[in-house]
Design a protein with these regions (language model features):
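ABC transporter nucleotide-binding domains
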Residues: 2-6, 11-203, 209
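Solvent-exposed beta-strand sheet faces enriched in polar/charged residues
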Residues: 7, 63, 228, 279-281
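Residues that scaffold the ATP/ADP-binding catalytic core of kinase and kinase-like folds
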Residues: 70, 216, 288, 292
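Conserved NTP-handling cores and scaffolds of large molecular machines
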Residues: 103, 220, 243, 282, ...
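C-terminal coupling/interaction segments
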Residues: 257-304
Length: 304
């Protein structure tokens, strides 16, 4: 069952078109990465999913209903948009208790989510004394109070140290393994490559990709082949003549694009060129993202 359904979603502020006819779905049992350059419309889309902003056109449903029609929203969807949105003088326990009581949730859930996020030992400490990583955990604990099947996180690893990033990555994967739908935005491509099962990429408010990570990297190309040979100059000539693009790599190697590893190997055999290395270099998620969104950034540098 689809848990988040976005159809033809459009948001306009005056003459500024922030989200433009956007459609995608988020499925249970997986982490869906929500990616795009700054100003792409990610945060605005999340706000519309959560009923914090009204669409100009289109629709978005959560579990088959609009957010405002959910009788007890926290039991359907939990969201963390700003981990700093907590009273600094209030303890972690009292912060969560206030949320539970005001939403008609059992008090026992406070202790359960504190334990699950590793905050039970500091439950009596004022949130204002928490580190950034602990505040993120407190925000995640709040999203779990209603035991929802849908979870939304906006840039949850921003500013965290490697230990904090790894904890959140593993926790996202754990939540998805329980059959929950997890939608997470991030600008850290290396992190998304390790966390997400599926990607939704937008640029200037429009959908650019709705696919798996491997499929995205394959579709955008950018793969190269690293070659080492005792006679790089001569082989570079043959590679160029065959339609390849050749540039010098490290320590006398050649980096070739436009030809596959199989084609390069056959070319070397035909011309009697012995190769000491032939290694396909797969494009990274960051490479694929940059290629896909290169025409959708708000500003671009100009080479001198």
């Amino acid at each position: 069952m689809t848990t988040i359904e976005v159809r033809g979603l459009t948001k306009q502020y005056g003459s500024d078109l922030v989200v433009d006819d956007l459609s995608f779905s988020v499925e249970p049992g997986q982490v869906t990465g929500f990616l795009g350059p700054n100003g792409a419309g990610k945060s605005t889309t999340m706000k519309m999913i959560l009923g914090l902003a009204a669409p100009t056109r289109g629709s978005v449903t959560v579990g088959g209903r609009s957010y405002r029609d959910l009788p007890v929203p926290l039991t359907e969807v939990g969201a963390l948009l700003d981990a700093g949105a907590v009273h600094g003088a209030r303890t972690a326990y009292n912060h969560l208790l206030a949320l539970a009581v005001s939403n008609g949730l059992p008090r026992r859930r406070v202790g359960e989510v504190l334990g699950r996020t590793g905050l039970d030992a500091v439950a009596g400490r004022p949130a204002g004394r928490f580190s950034l990583g602990m505040r993120q955990r407190l925000g995640i604990a709040a999203t779990l109070l209603g035991d929802p099947r849908i979870l939304i996180f906006d840039e949850p690893v921003n500013g965290l140290d490697p230990e904090g990033i790894r904890w959140i990555r593993d926790f996202m994967r754990e939540l998805a393994a329980e059959g929950r739908a997890v939608l997470v935005s991030s600008h850290l491509m290396s992190e998304m490559a390790q966390t997400a099962d599926h990607l939704v990429v937008i640029g200037r408010g429009r959908l650019m990709a709705d696919t798996g990570i491997a499929e995205l990297m394959h579709a955008t190309g950018n793969g190269t082949v690293l070659v080492r040979t005792a006679d790089p100059g001569s082989f570079a000539y043959h590679l160029t003549a065959a339609g390849g693009t050749v540039r010098d790599g490290l320590e006398g190697s050649l980096v070739i694009s436009g030809l596959s590893g199989v084609e390069i190997g056959k070319l070397a055999a035909y011309h009697g060129v012995p190769l000491s290395e032939l290694t396909p270099q797969r494009a990274s998620l960051e490479d694929a993202f940059m290629e896909l969104t290169k025409d959708s950034v708000e500003y671009q540098g100009v080479a001198a």
